[in-house]
Every structure is written in structure tokens, then in C-alpha cells.
From Swiss-Prot:
The species this protein was found in: Xenopus laevis
Similarity comment text for this entry: Belongs to the PRPH2/ROM1 family.
Subcellular location: Membrane
Name by which UniProt lists this protein: RDS/peripherin-like protein xRDS36
Glycosylation sites recorded in the entry for this protein: 54, 229
Plastid recorded as keyword: no
Main location: membrane
Gene Ontology, cellular component aspect: plasma membrane
TM helices/strands, residue ranges: 25-43, 62-80, 100-123, 265-290
């Protein structure tokens, strides 16, 4: 049973070809936008790679970049086909490329949908990766002389300044680790000895944060040492508005930042998907309506076009059979070629 059959006069075929041409180049432009957004997200994830536990989230920009590239290529070739569809002689040159084109176009739509699903599904994975990565970055903050960890301090300092955040979940995360290297501690000092002895595992812990947690907009000089001790500072209340360090955790800040970029990527991919689907449908109508024209001198004849010649399942099964037959014929040709080569030697 033919699905979505439509009649096309010569004028309607011309308008269809013009519409296809416009949609094709819009698809190219949106593909460029999608590709650029994917590259931007990839770079941003790479910049903060040191405060992430794994690179699973990179699957999102990789898929978006792929969707953008495929969209550009398919849009370009669809535009070329639309221009050739008005000349039966030129159109015949593209006829053999139609089925591979449709296969790639459907695959491209699937990639777009996969990018959308990954943008939503990997949010939890990204949050967990940031949670573990930031926790390790804070723990290794002091290890500036240790190979593999020497850039953790710089990465964490830059992150807190750029995103106006402090710690993993909140500033108190710094209270739970020794973030000052033993290299810069005076072990002859009674205060240092007392702090180390008071810690269960012999660490130098204090209720203080790095300078990068300070809010430069505060009129008061930054209070970054003995933050929870109200009596250590004049006219100060830790529970009130006197705190002049960032109270937002870096995980929340980064997650919000990446979620915003992914939402923009999702919008670009959605638009790309809609355009590619429109190009696919339009090109299918162009193909089926042009295939009805047998005589090159009868280009202006009325024809019929359709999306599917059979039902959906029948079309899928028929396509799978054609693909299987194609692979079988290739295997036979390869085997015959190998046999001839062996006989010749």
C-alpha cells in the first residue's frame, strides 16, 4: 500500500525543488551552528578536565559534532540534487546516489535524537563526575610538587575566581582537608603542632579557605581565616551577611554552566533534526515524482509522488533484504577474486 501519495504538476515540482533547495541550505547553516556549538562544549569540558573524574560527558559534544558535520554534508548534496531535478539528464546522474543518501539521512536523524537523549541522560553522570573530580582537586590542592597533581592548585584557583564559587558543595569543604603543603608549615610553632595533634589523622586543618574564595565586591577586607570564629573578627557574624567569601559550591556553578550550554546544543540539534527530516521528506517526493517521467521530452507531465511504496514494516524488511543481498554479492566477488589470484600464482 502506497503511503502519503500526492500528485505533482510541473509547477508543483518546481516549487518542491525550490523549497528543497531552501531547506537544504538552511540545513547547512544550522549544521554549521550545531558543529560550532559542539566544538564549544567540547573545549569547555576539556578546559575543566582536571576537576572531572571521567570523560563520559564528552559523548555529548562528540555526538553533536557528528550530527553537525553530517547535517552540513547532507544539506549540501540535497541542494545539488534539487538544482539537478529540473533537468532529467542531470537528475539521472544523481539517481544512483539516492538510496545511500536516504540511508545516511535517516542515520543522521538518529544521531540527532541520540545527541538529545545524551544531553538529558548524562546530566547525572556529569554531576557525579564533577563531585568526585572537585573532591580530589581540593584534596590534592597542596601537592604542587607531586607529578600529575602540580596543576591542581592552579586549576582550582582559576575555577573559583572565574565561576565565583568556593569548595565542592560549599566553603566548608576546605575545612575538611589540609590544603596547605607541609613545605610551608613551621613545625617548630606551637600552633602548628597543636593543630596537627588535634587532628585524628595528623593533618593541619583549619576553618579557612584559599584567597580565590574571596568576593572582591565586598567593601570589607576578605575574612578567609577563622571564618566560623565570630570573636576573632570585629563586628562579624558567620551566620549573617558579614561573610565575604563565595558561598556557592563549584559543582553547582559548573553544573549550571554546562547545563546551559547543553540546552543550547539541544535547541540547535532539534532544529537540525527538523530541517533534515524536512529535507528527507521533500527529496523523497522529488525522487518518486521524477522517477515517473520516462520521456526526456515530457518533463512537464503530471506525476505522482509518495513517501513509501509499501507499508512501514514491509519497507524496512525490503531494505534489510537489499542490504543483505548487497553484502552477499560483495562477499562472492571477493571470494572469486581471491580464487583467481590463487590460480594465477
Amino acid at each position: 500500500m502506497v503511503l502519503f501519495k500526492a500528485k505533482f504538476s510541473f509547477q508543483r515540482r518546481v516549487k518542491l525543488a525550490q523549497t528543497l533547495w531552501l531547506l537544504s541550505w538552511l540545513s547547512v547553516l544550522v549544521g554549521c551552528l550545531t558543529f560550532g556549538m559542539g566544538i564549544f562544549l567540547k573545549v569547555q569540558l576539556w578546559i575543566h578536565n582536571e576537576v572531572m573524574d571521567n570523560t563520559t560527558a564528552h559523548a555529548v559534544p562528540n555526538t553533536v559534532i557528528t550530527a553537525g558535520l553530517v547535517g552540513i554534508l547532507l544539506g549540501y548534496f540535497a541542494g545539488k540534487i534539487s538544482q539537478a531535478s529540473m533537468d532529467l539528464t542531470k537528475y539521472q546522474r544523481w539517481k544512483s546516489f539516492m538510496m545511500p543518501f536516504f540511508f545516511l539521512a535517516i542515520l543522521s536523524c538518529i544521531v540527532c535524537l541520540a545527541a538529545l537523549v545524551l544531553s538529558v541522560a548524562l546530566r547525572g553522570t556529569l554531576e557525579e563526575s564533577l563531585k568526585i573530580g572537585l573532591r580530589n582537586a581540593i584534596r590534592f590542592y597542596k601537592d604542587t610538587d607531586t607529578p600529575g597533581r602540580c596543576y591542581q592548585k592552579r586549576s582550582m584557583d582559576k575555577l573559583e575566581m572565574d565561576f565565583q564559587c568556593c569548595g565542592n558543595n560549599h566553603p566548608k569543604d576546605w575545612f575538611e582537608v589540609q590544603w596547605i603543603s607541609n613545605r610551608y608549615l613551621d613545625f617548630s610553632s606551637k600552633e602548628v603542632k597543636d593543630r596537627i595533634k588535634s587532628s585524628v589523622d595528623g593533618r593541619y586543618l583549619m576553618d579557612s579557605v584559599p584567597f580565590t574564595c574571596c568576593n572582591p565586591s565586598s567593601p570589607r577586607p576578605c575574612i578567609q581565616i577563622e571564618i566560623t570564629n565570630n570573636s576573632a573578627h570585629y563586628s562579624y557574624n558567620f551566620q549573617g551577611d558579614d561573610v565575604n567569601i563565595w558561598v556557592r559550591g563549584c559543582r553547582e556553578a559548573l553544573l549550571g554552566y554546562y547545563t546551559g550550554i547543553m540546552a543550547t546544543n539541544g535547541a540547535a540539534v532539534t532544529l537540525s533534526f527538523l530541517l533534515q527530516a524536512s529535507v528527507l521528506v521533500s527529496l523523497r517526493y522529488v525522487q518518486t515524482s521524477m522517477d515517473k517521467i520516462r520521456d526526456p521530452d515530457d518533463v512537464e507531465a503530471d506525476t505522482e509522488g509518495f513517501l513509501l511504496e509499501k507499508g512501514v514494516m514491509e519497507t524496512v524488511n525490503s531494505s534489510l533484504e537489499k542490504i543483505k543481498d548487497l553484502f552477499k554479492s560483495n562477499q562472492v566477488e571477493t571470494a572469486e577474486g581471491g580464487g583467481e589470484g590463487a590460480a594465477g600464482s
